[in-house]
Amino acid sequence: MKVSKDKSKKGVKSKPKTSRKPLSLKQKLQRESKIVKVDNLNWKAVDIPDNLDDYQGFYGLEEIDGVDVKVTGGNVEFVVKDNSKVKDSDNEEDDDDVHDDDDNQDDGDDDQDDDDVDIEDDEDEIIEGDNEDDFKGFDDDNAINEDDQMDIESAKTEKKSKKEVKPKNEKVAKKDSILESAFKNVDLTLPDDNEVNLPYWDDLSLSSFTLNGLSALEYEKPTAIQKRTIPLAIEGKDVIGKAITGSGKTLAYGIPILERHLQKMAKANQSKKVINPPTGIIFAPTRELAHQVVDHLNRIAKFTPLSQHGIVSITGGLSIQKQERLLSHGPGIVVATPGRFLELLQKDMALVQRLSCTDIVVLDEADRLLQDGHFDEFVKILELFGKHRPRDNKELEWKWQTLVFSATFSRDLFGKLDKHLKSNKNKEEMGSSLIDNDEILQLLNDKLKFKDSKPTLVDANPKEMVAGQITEALVECGPTERDLYLYYFLLLYPGSTLVFANSIDSVKRLAPFLNNLKVPTFSIHSSMIQKQRLRTLERFKEASSKNSTAVLIASDVAARGLDIPNIDHVAHYHLPRSADVYIHRSGRTGRAGKEGVSIMFCSPQESSGPLRKLRKLVANNTKKRTRLNVHNDVKLLPLEMDLVSQIKPRVTLASKLADAERSSSSTRKEDNWVHEAAEELGIDNLSDIDNFEDDFIKRQRKRKENKALTKDEARSLRLELNDLLSKQIRKNSRRSYLTSGLQNLAHQMVTGNTHKDVLGHASVNALDDLRTKKAIKKKQIKTKKVKDKK
């Protein structure tokens, strides 16, 4: 053959070909593919849209397609068939290894001599495959000419040069984006120090950066807790601070940490490539509170030279890889929830050694420590810090500074309200003052192990549990009438309202109930993922700014620390289980000096025991705490039964639709769970499963099935409800003529001096209806004085 002649010319001995078995499909795919490391893949950067406000871990996101993932022995391997998916520098290095492996797999049963023959035959096949596009017939010579070889090599070099240009351009674009984010605040115009006029903050001796931030936020005067704790914290003393909700506790510990960090930045040597430990670590009980603290500190630190990752949050529900990357940048302030923070520490001991060198540890909402079983992770974190904190570092103190803040520090507040209240005269005489409560101080000292032998105690409001600007009210109703009176309150008193319920099931039922009544309603509870919670809070804030009425239904996950602006009312759909929860719930309104309303919907069973115990513990005046008559310090909301009777049909229909929707979704989830479990166990026939169900489960299922509605029934009820909602409610509906009676409804309609949803009713405010005549006169006198001054 000519082929043998050509091979003899090149000095290759011809060998007789042996019979070779055909390649399988798996072997063909293996011949075409190769295993590549993850770093050698040709990743592409993902462009983030400009309208995306919350990135949620999408910084530096890259993607690739056309790559198979294979797991062998616990190791993840990336299999590539197309060389364009691999960086050019790695193509040539990996080709030889892959071909050798394929040949060994194909010819493992043959002798060594046969392997050599097959490899040579494979080389001939590869040469023929490369020239298939240029094939024009049978030539006398099948050998490749030197000119053709030069053309092939030049084409390969051109392809490589084109591929090399692309990643370089991508790297340049990445560098430009990084530089833009790093220097985005360079053009920020700093206010002149001479223009900052904050005389009330002068005694605290703060830096110009912090004063500029306070001036931009228009914080002209420090609150009582800030004025008393900031100087002590700057001096390095351990502080235990107690103040009512909404009194500015975040800045009381945030400003001292910021001042300490600015001093460290001025002394630090920037040339050293060392990851510095954070100046302060702040622990919060909930994820929402941690994100809120970060946002608040970033606004104060707007004019400081902090980097982009100067203040970071470490919470559950978000990407742990992103949080590890944030900590690797060496942030100055870390705000964390104990669970996720402990998880990161247990993964990396080097991180423990670095974070244990922090200067300040803050515990926000520290009263949770006093409850058994809470914050066990926080105690473990302190133990890790104590073991790994270096002792031989002269610049570092032997112990970190500890700052503790909360609105409630009385252990009596954590007891269940439905239990019998044991009267203790000593405790009643002691009052709610933090300074007199030695038991609480001993518990905190045992768990936190302060640096100072006696931490400094600051009680800004010794006689107040609930803020004085919050008006408390009560609605006495039956257990099944809560929906009716809740809708009555929301209809008559427009504004942003936060409704608290004791169970997640109630939260899930109330949201569709109010939405059926055309009330803009959102819900948040602990079973939602973190992104859903944050998104719900943003939507509620947006709706409350646009609409006159917006409602957020929440479980106790939103009771602590959340600073949602402009909350007019807090409604307790259920009476809270403990007094501390009531204090924190009510503290969501009446913040930053504004007034608010906290209203309870209470059944007769609750008013006889739990409500009485709550009022004894929470009453503002400690001398009057032992009074048995609850109504003396809680005002009853005035009810107009004419309006209640008119809205009752609406509420009944909306409640039926909400119950049907809730029952159908719950039964659907139960059925799906049963079918999935049956498939895993290999059970095909589920007809006999009812025989094995418990009687209680059967009754519960029947109760849900009775509430369920067919599509036609639900459609007819919804049409009937929409018809009722289209008709406007009218005050004194028995009147036959608009112009009859003492009030001229026609004149009110023409002049616009009427309620938005209730015809013939003046536009009212819950605060005005709950105030006494004396309080109304005082307010009128104050408004007149302000007008006269102007």
Swiss-Prot record:
**Could you identify this protein by its name?**
ATP-dependent RNA helicase MAK5
Extract the InterPro entries matched here.
DEAD/DEAH_box_helicase_dom, DEAD_box_RNA_helicase, Helicase_ATP-bd, Helicase_C-like, P-loop_NTPase, RNA-helicase_DEAD-box_CS, RNA_helicase_DEAD_Q_motif
Domain annotation Helicase ATP-binding: ranges: 230-427
The scientific name of the source species is Debaryomyces hansenii (strain ATCC 36239 / CBS 767 / BCRC 21394 / JCM 1990 / NBRC 0083 / IGC 2968)
Q: Where is this motif: Q motif?
A: 199-227
Sequence motif: DEAD box, positions: 364-367
Q: Does the keyword Transcription regulation apply?
A: no
Q: Which UniProt keywords apply?
A: ATP-binding, Helicase, Hydrolase, Nucleotide-binding, Nucleus, Ribosome biogenesis, RNA-binding, rRNA processing
Bias (Basic residues) ranges = 7-20
The role this protein plays is:
ATP-binding RNA helicase involved in the biogenesis of 60S ribosomal subunits and is required for the normal formation of 25S and 5.8S rRNAs.
Superkingdom, according to UniProt?
A: Eukaryota
Q: Which GO terms describe its biological process?
A: rRNA processing
In terms of CDD domains, this protein maps to: DEADc_DDX24 (cd17946), SF2_C_DEAD (cd18787)
Gene that codes for this?
MAK5
User: A Pfam family name for this chain?
Assistant: DEAD
Localization (cell):
Nucleus, Nucleolus
